[in-house]
């Protein structure tokens, strides 16, 4: 059984945490994130460590304990280091480009697919077959990357599509002739 919630989080220098009711605000060199946490979980900041505690050992409180601790740890990492996801476009004629603040994908449809840049995210296209998404919120970065990947997920026969960098696509064999 996981005991993530019992681990203390080390707060790096330059990062400041404030709690007002159920709202936790983390401020650091890369920005500021505010998130609400479960009201049954209490957070104590002692020096350069944040500790979390729960009132009892019910299954719901145990789950919220670990989730809350992980969310706050991700907030701290986001404002100090940031998060980054890289995507690759594999396929003949598959291209990505930036037009102003719009990401434009040409991935085999009769029309280009456009995405507006989200608030708090930096989208870059280093070359025509790679997309880089950076931000301080792990959830926002991952959601936006998943939304882009969902336009044309990698197919198992030729491996064409949009994939995360380093993602291994399980390949299938084609039909055999008679």
From Swiss-Prot:
Record-level GO BP terms: cytoplasmic translation
Stretches that traverse the bilayer? none
UniProt keyword annotations, A-Z: Ribonucleoprotein, Ribosomal protein, RNA-binding, rRNA-binding
Which Pfam families does the record cross-reference, listed alphabetically? Answer: Ribosomal_L6
Q: Which GO terms describe its cellular component?
A: cytosolic large ribosomal subunit
The cross-references to InterPro entries, in alphabetical order and at most eight, read: Ribosomal_uL6-like, Ribosomal_uL6-like_a/b-dom_sf, Ribosomal_uL6_a/b-dom, Ribosomal_uL6_bac-type, Ribosomal_uL6_CS
The answer to keyword Cytoplasm applying to this record is: no
Q: Which Gene3D superfamilies match?
A: Ribosomal protein L6, alpha-beta domain
SUPFAM superfamilies according to UniProt: Ribosomal protein L6 (SSF56053)
GO MF annotations in UniProt: rRNA binding; structural constituent of ribosome
Q: Which family does the similarity line name?
A: Belongs to the universal ribosomal protein uL6 family.
Subunit and partners? Part of the 50S ribosomal subunit.
Its biological purpose is as follows: This protein binds to the 23S rRNA, and is important in its secondary structure. It is located near the subunit interface in the base of the L7/L12 stalk, and near the tRNA binding site of the peptidyltransferase center.
Q: What is this protein called?
A: Large ribosomal subunit protein uL6
Q: Which organism is it from?
A: Oenococcus oeni (strain ATCC BAA-331 / PSU-1)
